[in-house]
Amino acid sequence: MPSGVFQKRPKAAETISLFCMILIRLSRAADDSHETSTLLATITTITTEIIPMPDSGRSCFGWSSAPEAAGGNCSRSNRNGTLKCYGGMNNLAALNQSGKLSRVQPALEMLLCGWPKDGLNHFRDLQKLPRLRSLTIEYSGFTEFKFDFPEMLELHTINISWTNLSYISSRTFKRVHPLKVLDLRWNQLIQLDGPLLLPRNFEQLYLAGNPWNCTRNFKWLLLQPEKGRLVVDRDELICTDRKYKERQMLMVMHYKLELKRQCQSHEDLRNCTCLMHHILPKTHIPLYTVNCSHLQFHRLPDFLPDNTTTLVINDNMISDINPLRDNPHYRHVVDMQLENNQISNVDNLEDTYWLQNFRLLNLRGNNLRKLHVYALDNALDDNENANLLLLSRNPWHCTCKFGSRMRELLTKYKDIVRDAWNVSCTYRLDDDQLLAKVLTLSRQEMCNLSVEGGTQIHPIDWLNGVLASLIFLILGKLAYDYYYYKYYGRVPWIVMKMP
């Protein structure tokens, strides 16, 4: 073939060379199987996660097409001493009696494919294979191990992958003393009760590819370095729970430990509950919630962990909320739960950064009687983040001026003040027990019956009456002048006397 053909298609030559290299790698022995999967993983890249391609020589891939699968039997490969069982181990005793598993030709490796039961409980059969060094269980439907693994004198590698295994006890592999490598990738494990109890000389644990729930306790990965280092692929563990979906487990655990350290380092927060409720998608910044309810606080905490966005401090004795204005630790706190405290004044928040940027403010069950309605109105009008404001169960007093403005505010922001219909007030100074819902009170009830006016007719109503009378007087005068001019041809004498 002319050389010019290869010169025009250099990419084709590279592709052929790469394909040949893959074939060579696939034909290598078991010691290179890890390199093979690594090579294939670099070629077969998926945007969300990399799924390893199983090695057909050491895997159960396509096991259901094997002749032994119909009867749940095993077959012995004399070439490498591998015992393959498909859907069960029904003929294992027969193989022993036939001498195919004798000391002269012991089974060194075992593949258990397609185990159909929910629980794998035939581990005692493994003791019939005393020279077994490697055990692989794949493509099986069991969800847990009924019993712990028995003592095995030479079993140093266990691979359990592509199964429905969802629970594993920390003691499952404790008695396998020669164990050095344990591969639990690509199962359905959600959590571990704690670090697995493994032999002293254990070397490598693989856990990637499982749907881990990072709301559970995996802090031991960082708190117990000698245990955490055994998890070779710890950087690849991904959370799948709703709260931390697609986040790295190590990152989530690091943030949890840092939050715990900050909360325990400050005296105000030692009895509080500190939680991480979210991690921002792009920046991976953690957002924290601090709950100090029912702890007899007389003031807001002086310190909050970095990135705290929610403070729940209900059912305490707090009366001063000035830290929302002055304390820089509260700058990023957008949700404040202050229900059932002793707050009587919120006017200090007027024109503050916090009031113009808050998202949730719960002031139910406090001692509020009045507030600057215009300041709150301006803040809610400018605040695009405001989502919830709760004001009910306060001893509001509706004077004529405040009550009217409060009613307008509740009507205007009913989508934000969601308990607006439950906001009640007293509207008579001589009867503090007479409560009415602000949205149902008329202006006449708030003004005419108020002791503030001293009479049943408010001065504003008197002024309105006078102005109305003057208007009617002017209109009457114009009508008289028009009539007089029409019938007498001249304006009234009083107009003639005017300069």
Swiss-Prot record:
Protein name per the record: Protein singed wings 2
GO biological process, one term: response to ecdysone
Family matches, as PANTHER family: ANTIGEN BSP, PUTATIVE-RELATED (PTHR24369), CHAOPTIN-RELATED (PTHR24369:SF210)
Record Gene3D superfamilies: Ribonuclease Inhibitor
Domain LRRCT stretches: 210-265, 394-449
Organism of derivation: Drosophila melanogaster
Record function comment: Has a role in the ecdysone induced cascade; probably indirect control of 'late' ecdysone genes.
Keywords: Leucine-rich repeat, Repeat, Signal
Sequence ranges of the LRR repeats: 154-175, 178-199, 307-328, 332-353, 357-378
Origin organism lineage: Eukaryota, Metazoa, Ecdysozoa, Arthropoda, Hexapoda
Gene Ontology terms: cellular component: plasma membrane
The organism's place on the tree of life at top rank: Eukaryota
Signal peptide: 1-29
